[in-house]
Amino acid sequence: MQLHLSASCWLPSVAAVRVYYFHRTVRCGDCLRIDQMSSETLKETFHQELTDGHLEWRPTNLDLPENTHFMFDYDLNANELVVVRDDGKQPVFNKLPEVWELVYHPAKFCSMLIDLVREQLAQPN
């Protein structure tokens, strides 16, 4: 699902693409597994992009007061993995609810995340 945001509900960033894993303070085993698989996939596949600042990985605790706005910014229902493309004009975000179905299928999980991040990184600024 791809949604557009108004410019008023995003935070400026050097990175053109940000990957968020939104979670709560108390997390189940599957929540921790999604966080771990996402982190490892991004670090292994996009090391250079993370290093040079074109990509950011942001696990974010929604229970912290400073992060509650994300619930509205990205229309979050629960713990979610979200890829945000920020061209400086109109941020676009993709929620990945299918991670819950793929949590025990690491190859498919990683492939889905890699494909979406590559697609977003390939977009012109």
Please annotate each region the language model reported.
Residues 83-124:
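Non-catalytic, surface beta->alpha helical segment in thiol-disulfide oxidoreductase systems
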Residues 27-31, 35, 64, 102-110:
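Solvent-exposed, acidic/flexible segments
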Residues 1-5:
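N-terminal targeting signals for export/organelle localization
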Residues 50-66:
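Thiol-based oxidoreductase modules, predominantly thioredoxin-like and allied folds used
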Residues 66, 71-86, 90-92:
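Structural micro-motif
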Residues 13-46:
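Local sequence-structure signature of Cys/Sec-based thiol-disulfide redox active-site neighborhoods
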Residues 9-15, 119-125:
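N-terminal leader/targeting and pre-domain segments
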